[in-house]
Structure formats: structure tokens, C-alpha cells
Design a protein with these regions (language model features):
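Cys/His-clustered metal-coordination modules, chiefly Zn-binding fingers
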Residues: 142-195
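Hydrophobic, aromatic-lined core segments that form the binding pocket/scaffold
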Residues: 2-164
Length: 195
């Protein structure tokens, strides 16, 4: 980025922070948190959204965000190169989440959130940290709202990333194992003592 584009991006990020902080809709607050967590580190590509998905999400959740800010933020999104294994995991988890999407939620919003969650499972930390949320309870509330049937299946109260990896394994008909990002987590040995 040049100094000019850095400044434009920083202004756009400030506008997004303001829009998220002043959102009167819980979903806008959630998406504001998810997006600003990555935008603040210039990691919007890690959300796993295409530029069109990202632009649509901003338009739906933050309709008062200036178009110049949307363009500045969207211009930093590049396709994520994923290995075949990671790509298959993301696609399977995304489909599994969408199978359980709350019909009362806008389908495009559920689709964006499913992509964000699936891509967060590739990173090496607890899911709540990878999403930029403030704890497991925030992940539980998000999943209960957007994917209630899936959330209800976690009767053993597994850590969410581990549970989602098990959902992928069930979909693929393979033995359960860790999500791609799990081996880098500080608690990997706790979640997978035999791995």
C-alpha cells in the first residue's frame, strides 16, 4: 500500500468501526466485530469472502457506510490459496453450516458467516479468538442464532472448533479428527490427547 492508500484504508476502517459501534441491529454488531478484527490487521482476505460477498455484506449490515470506504476495504481482499485438504474442509463445513441455517436469517448473511467460520477453523487458536470475539459464549450465541440445529447438536459441550471438525467428519464419513488449524493451538494436547 502507498501512503495515500494507507490513509484511505485507515479512514475506511475508522468509518467501519464507527458504523459497527453505532449499529442498532445485533447482526450488524456481530459482523462489525468479525470484520474489524481482521481489517485492523489488514487481514480481510482471511475472512474467506469474495469481494462481491464482502461488498454485499457491508451494504446489508452497514447501509450508511460511504461507498469510498467500501471500495477501500474491498480493494485489500485477495483470493486465499488453500491446499486441497483445506479447501475440502472449508467447503464441507460451509455446506454443513448452511444445511442448518436459520430460515429467519437472510440467506446471504448466513452464507457469509458460514464462510467466515469455516475459514477461521484453518487458523491455530480457539475459534472465538480466530473470529475476534470475546469468548466461547459469544460463539455459542452466534451459532445458536444463525445455525440453531447445529448448535443444539453440541450436547457434549465440546470446544466449538473441535465440534465443527467432528461435523465435517460426519459429513465425509470419516473418523473424527482436528480442524486444520487445531495443531497450532496451545490446547491441542488437551482436545486431542492421542494425536
Amino acid at each position: 500500500m502507498t501512503a495515500s492508500t494507507d490513509h484511505t484504508y485507515e479512514e475506511a476502517l475508522q468509518s467501519l468501526h464507527f458504523a459497527a459501534a453505532n449499529a442498532d441491529v445485533p447482526d450488524a454488531q456481530l459482523f462489525g466485530t468479525l470484520v474489524t478484527a481482521r481489517a485492523g490487521r489488514n487481514e480481510l482476505s482471511l475472512l474467506g469472502l469474495s469481494p462481491d460477498q464482502f461488498t454485499g455484506l457491508l451494504a446489508r449490515q452497514f447501509p450508511h457506510l460511504r461507498s469510498v470506504d467500501t471500495v477501500a476495504l474491498t480493494s485489500t481482499i485477495a483470493p486465499l490459496p488453500l491446499s486441497a485438504t483445506h479447501s475440502a474442509f472449508v467447503a464441507t463445513l460451509h455446506a454443513r453450516l448452511m444445511d442448518d441455517a436459520n430460515p429467519a436469517i437472510a440467506r446471504d448473511d448466513a452464507d457469509c458467516l458460514a464462510a467466515i467460520i469455516a475459514h477461521a477453523c484453518l487458523r491455530p487458536d480457539h475459534l472465538w479468538r480466530d473470529l475476534g470475539l470475546d469468548g466461547r459464549d459469544a460463539v455459542s450465541a452466534m451459532l445458536a442464532r444463525f445455525f440453531p440445529a447445529l448448535a443444539a447438536r453440541n450436547v457434549a459441550h465440546l470446544r466449538w472448533k473441535k465440534f465443527l471438525a467432528q461435523e465435517v467428519a460426519v459429513s465425509l464419513g470419516v473418523p473424527p479428527g482436528p480442524a486444520p488449524g487445531c495443531p497450532g493451538c496451545e490446547d491441542f494436547g488437551f482436545c486431542f490427547p492421542r494425536a
